Amino acid sequence: GVDIIGLSRALITNIQSGYFKEGGSTITQQVSRLIFLNNDLNFKRKIKEIIISLVLDLKYSKNQILKLYLNNIYLGSGAYGINEAAQVYFGKLITELTLSEIALITGLAPSPSIYSPYKNIDLAIKKRNKILKSMYIDGFISLYERNKALNEKVKLNYQTNNNDLKDN
């Protein structure tokens, strides 16, 4: 959908600052941008994004939109989508990933260049741990699963072509 309150807040902040400082995008809006538009920072593109998002909401379920997002989001090192990220970072199929590895990939989403385990493993692990904590608090995993994932050593795949320089 479209988060009217978030968009309004972003609009006010952007007008006050004189430049694009906030976006206020929902997952559906990010899918619209990822698949149909570009990252240009202008109001015309934002209006198109909102219209496409409304159409997507009418045509697809939330799960289908989430699937589109997860299969198209850039996760660093040349990986688009979680399937490619599983291969790039761990040399595995997504079905072979551990909870710890899934949490690490999830942590890349906000900023793949900042949270890249190839560039800053400590920061990537810190983000992974924060995600595992949230998953435990929200009841998605047990204390045992959280602790097991927290104690798992990160074993990155250095065999694939590491395109991390693209993220600079």
Give the ranges of each region predicted by the language model.
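Conserved catalytic or metal-liganding residues and their short signature motifs at active sites
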Residues: 1-13, 19, 137-138, 146
